[in-house]
Amino acid sequence: MINKTTIKTVLITLGVLAAVNKVSALRSVKRLIS
């Protein structure tokens, strides 16, 4: 059985990775524009 804490940890990890991807994407876009 999967614990709720495990699910929370996975969701938090995915959220952090998504945030990092957004930041890197924004930086690359700014480089292309400038």
Curated annotation (Swiss-Prot):
Presence of keyword Cytoplasm: no
CC annotations in GO: membrane; viral inner membrane; virion membrane
Gene Ontology biological process: symbiont entry into host cell via disruption of host cell envelope; symbiont entry into host cell via disruption of host cell wall peptidoglycan
Topological type in the membrane: Single-pass membrane protein
Transmembrane domains' residue ranges: 10-26
Keywords, alphabetical: Capsid inner membrane protein, Degradation of host cell envelope components during virus entry, Degradation of host peptidoglycans during virus entry, Membrane, Transmembrane, Transmembrane helix, Virion, Virus entry into host cell
Compartmental location: Virion membrane
Chief site of localization: virion
Function: Exolysin that catalyzes the cleavage of the host peptidoglycans during virus entry.
Protein name (database record): Peptidoglycan hydrolase P7
Organism of this sequence: Pseudoalteromonas phage PM2
Name of the coding gene: VII
